[in-house]
Amino acid sequence: SEEIPARMQKRAAAEFSQIFTSELEKVGLAYETANYFVTPRRITISIDGLPLQQATVVEERRGPRVDAPAPALDGFMRSNNISRDQIEERETKKGRFYFVEIETKGKLTKEVLPAIIETSLKKFAWPKSMRWGSNSFRWVRPLHSILAVFEAEVLHGELDLGHDKLVFTNMTKGHRCCGAEKISVANFADY
């Protein structure tokens, strides 16, 4: 972005990191460490130990009673997209019910991260913010780029600014006065 006011920098980096890690936890992505850094023109988050894929989740769903009318069982199977052979009967304190276990395979982390980045940016609230151009997105100063890399690959995503879109990239710029050339980033060491 352009110059972030000095009084806002440290708090902004800490808060943004907290929002981002909270979003990771919501989608079941565990991580080892999360570090944040701030400069007058950047907020940086580095997450170590992210898995390559979300964990597979097995959810148990209780259906109708065993003695319920057939349409109730048909509706349960249709709503869960299952067949009769996937259902089992179990005894509970309230009687005998049909149950099914639904297994949801985890998505690749690189497919989940772009939405987390966009959500985190939109959730973050600055004490004072602005819009620029004909965009509706608000930030402390105009955003120029979003560097987003996972496992040496650019994440395929974008931030919808309202009128324009800011596509994620693996490029950043050096110091604006002493070397503003573009720098390609594949990992945190490159950054």
Where are these regions (language model features)?
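Long, basic N-terminal domains or extensions that often function
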Residues: 1-191
